[in-house]
């Protein structure tokens, strides 16, 4: 099973790239983690935010291979703790499909992305900067994988 993080935003600071890559490289070959960056729409004083969200959403959905399970990160989504995420990861593996996790931009996700999702996950009740979410996601997914394989990374 491959996991894709599809995130709005490009040209992240070096610390974001390094943090994400630190966890991405730890994933096993049979469960690679891939990052697909979607160019954010230009947000100015008179920006049409609804149109920007629509364009970003179209680009996100176009990046998802046919048949993938779509999971959105969204405030009203399910709140999974680490053991619950590990259970989700196991269920996704048993489902036999790759997983695409969508990370929206500053205004969140387009309605079309939310409508296409099979699951919605609330990463935190906190508002997190979007660059940091990439690192938190990579680490959380790696930790969940470590639980499913009894790898010593996760300690209770």
Swiss-Prot record:
Coiled coil: none annotated. Its EC number is 2.1.1.177. Disulfide bonds: none annotated. CDD domains: RlmH-like. It catalyses: pseudouridine(1915) in 23S rRNA + S-adenosyl-L-methionine = N(3)-methylpseudouridine(1915) in 23S rRNA + S-adenosyl-L-homocysteine + H(+). Keywords: Cytoplasm, Methyltransferase, rRNA processing, S-adenosyl-L-methionine, Transferase. NCBIfam families: PRK00103.1-1 (NF000984), PRK00103.1-4 (NF000986), tRNA_RlmH_YbeA (TIGR00246). This is Ribosomal RNA large subunit methyltransferase H. It comes from Vibrio vulnificus (strain YJ016). The lineage of its organism: Bacteria, Pseudomonadati, Pseudomonadota, Gammaproteobacteria, Vibrionales.
């Amino acid at each position: 099973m491959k996991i894709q993080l599809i995130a709005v935003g490009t040209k992240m600071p070096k610390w974001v790239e390094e943090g994400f890559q630190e966890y991405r490289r730890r994933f096993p070959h049979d469960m690679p983690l891939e990052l697909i960056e979607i160019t954010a729409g230009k947000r100015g004083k008179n920006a049409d935010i609804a149109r920007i969200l629509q364009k970003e959403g179209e680009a996100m959905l176009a990046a998802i291979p046919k048949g993938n399970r779509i999971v959105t990160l969204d405030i009203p989504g399910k709140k999974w703790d680490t053991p619950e995420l590990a259970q989700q990861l196991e269920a996704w593996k048993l489902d036999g499909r790759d997983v695409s996790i969508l990370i929206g931009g500053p205004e969140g996700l387009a309605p079309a992305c939310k409508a296409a999702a099979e699951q919605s996950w609330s990463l935190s009740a906190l508002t997190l900067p979007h660059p940091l979410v990439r690192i938190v996601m990579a680490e959380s997914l790696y930790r969940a994988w470590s639980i499913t394989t009894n790898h010593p990374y996760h300690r209770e």
